[in-house]
Amino acid sequence: MKAIKIAIDGPASSGKSTVAKIIAKNLGYTYLDTGAMYRSATYIALTHGYTGKEVALILEELEKNPIFFKKAKDGSQLVFLGDEDVTLAIRQNDVTNNVSWISALPEIREELVHQQRRIAQAGGIIMDGRDIGTVVLPDAELKIFLVASVEERAERRYKENLEKGIESDFETLKEEIAARDYKDSHRKVSPLKAAEDALIFDTTGVSIDGVVQFIQEKAEKIVDMS
């Protein structure tokens, strides 16, 4: 049976990662959290006080402490920068609020996209992000673009933060998500947009199981036809 490449794109908190992880597990595919990679680069910049003018220093740190993933005992994914477990650190609000400008740096995107493509070569992979279907994996057999209302996405992020013990304010989250949408869709390099051949799916009011079922049925149909 042919293993395909699945690209899931969409704005912040549209459910990409949650859905991608479940589908990867169901299909026995590799899940690559590209967002965690950009968050890791952001964490480096914030930790060292680097600005957008110091891209070379950020890349140097990434070379010294490469990003890699491990599985925890409970099956969840851990993110490392060299020897440092940054799984929780990269989900903090300061990282969330700064990841857009890091993602917009051409040199950072070029390096991380190179890494992502290398990992995806063999197929049997599912990636989620902002530009997977348009830039990273334009040859992906299945491209999905998830959308949802700002209100619903803020509610999801609020619940996630509570579960992780991160203090949050719902109204502030709404403002931050709307601001990030604007930044992501208006940046010069790899702006957030659906690929021309992507299936656009509005997840507002749809359960996680419902979204998983929709994508998985499409994937299985493509595999059966190939």
UniProtKB/Swiss-Prot annotation:
GO terms for molecular function: ATP binding; CMP kinase activity; dCMP kinase activity. It catalyses: CMP + ATP = CDP + ADP; dCMP + ATP = dCDP + ADP. InterPro entries: Cytidylate_kin (IPR003136), Cytidylate_kinase_dom (IPR011994), P-loop_NTPase (IPR027417). Pfam families: Cytidylate_kin (PF02224). Its main location: cytoplasm. Belongs to the cytidylate kinase family. Type 1 subfamily. This is Cytidylate kinase. The gene is cmk.
